[in-house]
Every structure is written in C-alpha cells, then in structure tokens.
Amino acid sequence: MKQSYFSLLIFGATLLLGVRPSTSTDLPLELINLPPGFAIETFATNVVNARAMTLGHNGTLFVGSRSAGKIYALVDENQDMRSDKMYVVAEGLHAPIGVAFKDGSLYASAVDRILRYDNIETSLDQPPVPVTVTKSLPNERHHGWKFIDFGPDGMLYVPVGAPCNVCVRPDPFSSILRMRPDGSGMEVFARGIRNSVGFAWHPTTKTLWFTDNGRDNLGDDLPPGELNHAHKIGLHFGFPHCHGGDIPDPQFGKGADCS
C-alpha cells in the first residue's frame, strides 16, 4: 500500500506542481480516477512550470522546468508527504526539462547539453558548479527539450526530437541516444522517433518502452500517438515514412512498407 500511494503521489506531483498560485482545495483531485488502494494529494503548489522529476537518494525531489529555466529541489523535512522547503539549485538555463539522479549526482538537461551537479543533496543551499557531461546535442528548439534517464545498463538515455512537424534529417535527430555517465561513448540506440517525452524500462525484461508524439495536420486523431518498445539497439520505428505503425506519410511514405 505504501508503495502504491507514493507512486500516485509522484504522478499527482506531475500534474500539480506547476499550479501557482493555488491551494490544495482549488485543485480538482476528485476528477482523477484512481485504482483501488491508491490515493493522491498535493505535494507542492509553488513550483513554477514544473516538468520532469527525479528522486535523490535522500528523498529530495528534483524538478525540471521549461520556460522558467530553473531546476528546483523539494524537501519533505517532517516526512508528512508534503514539501516543506524549496530550493532553486540552477537557473538561467535553456529549457532544463530533463532530470535524472545517479551515484549522488543530479543530471540535468538543457536544449544542447547535459550538466551534472555532484553531491547535490548535501549542498542544496549552495549548489556546486555543474560539470558539463556533453554540450554536443542539437540546439534546435522545435522538439528541442531533452528528457533524460538512466537505463538498467547504467547508460544515460536522451531522446532527440525531429526539428520539424515531419521531415528527413540526419542523425541524431528523430532518435534516442545513449551515453556513459561521463558523456563518452554516445551512440544512437533507436531511430525513426519523432518526439518521445516519456520512457521507462520493464522491471523484469529490461526492455525500453517509450511514447512517440505523431505528426500534425493529418486530421482529427490521426495519426495516433505511439507506445513502442525496443528490445535491442538499432531498431527503426517508422518516422517520417510511417505513422502509428501502418499509416504512410503522404509526402515521405511513398514506397515505404508500413504494414
């Protein structure tokens, strides 16, 4: 029960952290349908433009943002499942949406780079100077924000979206990259992905599952968004030739096998 509650609390934070100004009584929590045994509450309401989140080893919740350009740290000091204190651990960044935590360090993305803040939970009030993991990511703003996470192989994964609605561009666009924690060994893990903003690994098979937001201007609800899984490196998931698995693109799908 405790694990289920906390999972939904974090899910709820995804929806509620960016609401400002507000109180918990203003939020329509009753509209969120939950399975039996789950509960949802407001964790914090003072985090502007909240996006991705990750937990530190000591329970600090780190939150990325987009237009705010900040990375926040939320601390629940009395263990009542509500944030008691908020720190801004970085600011002035270009869409620092993605955050991940490994070996005591916070990893944070901006559009064209990934930074690392070492021993961050011991210095929230005086954050360390970040280490640049990589600054070689594309800087195009269209689908340019970078969500990040560590896989079960210890590699850091980052999707790189297509810089357009639909187009053909060379690597690393329309792909998911991975690299070692120090930024070395960067490689394309999967291709043909327009814009993935959510991904996770199956706890048993370790297979990567990820969403893909389909192209615009084909019609209402067309193409559908995708939920894909990649059991090995080197797979191609169709973009820009095929959408939703079996829908040829009117411009780029000629001759493509979308069956």
Segments predicted by a language model, with ranges:
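Asp-box/WD-like beta-propeller blade repeats and closely related beta-sheet repeat scaffolds
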Residues: A100, D112-G151, P159-A162, G185, ...
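Surface loop/turn motifs at the tips and blade-to-blade linkers of beta-strand repeat domains
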Residues: T42-V47, Y87-G92, V133-E140, V188-G192
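Beta-propeller domain segments
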Residues: T23-P36, W145, P163-V166, S174, ...
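Conserved beta-propeller blade signature
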Residues: T60-G64, S105-A108, M155-P159, T207-T211
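Residue-level detector of Asp-centered blade-edge/turn motifs that repeat once per structural unit
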Residues: L55-N58, F101-D103, F150-D153, H202-T205
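Hydrophobic core register within WD40 beta-propeller blades
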Residues: M53, V99, I148, S196-F199
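Short loop/turn segments immediately following beta-strands, especially the blade-tip
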Residues: L74-D80, Y117-D125, K232-F237
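A short helix->beta-strand "capping" segment at the edge of beta-propeller domains
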Residues: D26-V48, D84
